[in-house]
Amino acid sequence: MDNFTKLYIQRCEPELAEFHFKRKRTTFVRVVNDVMQNFILEKLHGGRAYRVLFAVIPLCLPIEKTYISGGVYSYALRRFEIVRGTMAFDRWECNPKSNECIQACIESIMQFIRVHLMPFFECANCCRTALPELINLERRFNENRKASLQLAGIRDAAETDGVNLFDPVKYYMALKNGDYNFALKSRQVLERQNVYAYQDSMARGFLSPKSKLDRERAIQTLRKEIEYLQAGDTSYFHQLLLQNEAYSKENLKEIF
């Protein structure tokens, strides 16, 4: 563990004690109501830059043990604000040989955690509140990205509001909330993308017989879920969410 990481942990542990996070190496994690929240420090470019990634994951999405350590279904903390004067939109650049630079970088990260991350976590503390919070977050980050590019003299031609409909986190939150309209829209977008990718790979001859079968089964599963959503079959999804939540809680036992 390098000096930057040690100092960062020494700052985080006492300052975030009131929020009841558990630490696993460079990840801080907690479970609140029906969601898991975590954030992780990543070292980049041999210590010349650091990035903090955070996530809110519903327990009704089957949480693997690897998800606990962070970096899965995550967002970059730095994106809460518009970045000026650098193309490193998602990280803090740092001179690892300068103690003054290290301290300033850690102080900036801690300010982002206090001002942006903790208030966000407090609002997104269950599936019911986390889904709209994540949607608003993605839109905000998209606008910040465009503004950062503009400051760098780059025009963003992407026509999107930044909301990721492929995201399983929001899909499972929508199921838990009974928001079948959002869940249906999410699955339909994913099904179309899977069909396109399958047809393109077939045309290029990229798929082995096993890969072809796996892709076809995945598409059939999506279509089955779409049918259940269109029919409003709550019993199917109720059982699915119960099974997933039990699986997540079992995997979370190692830290809680």
Give each language-model segment a name:
Residues 1-4, 30-256:
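Intrinsically disordered, low-complexity regulatory regions enriched in serine/threonine/proline
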Residues 23, 27-31:
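Generic recognition of long tandem-repeat/solenoid scaffolds
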Residues 2-23:
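Amphipathic alpha-helical segments
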Residues 21-24, 45-47:
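Short, ordered beta-strand-loop transition motifs
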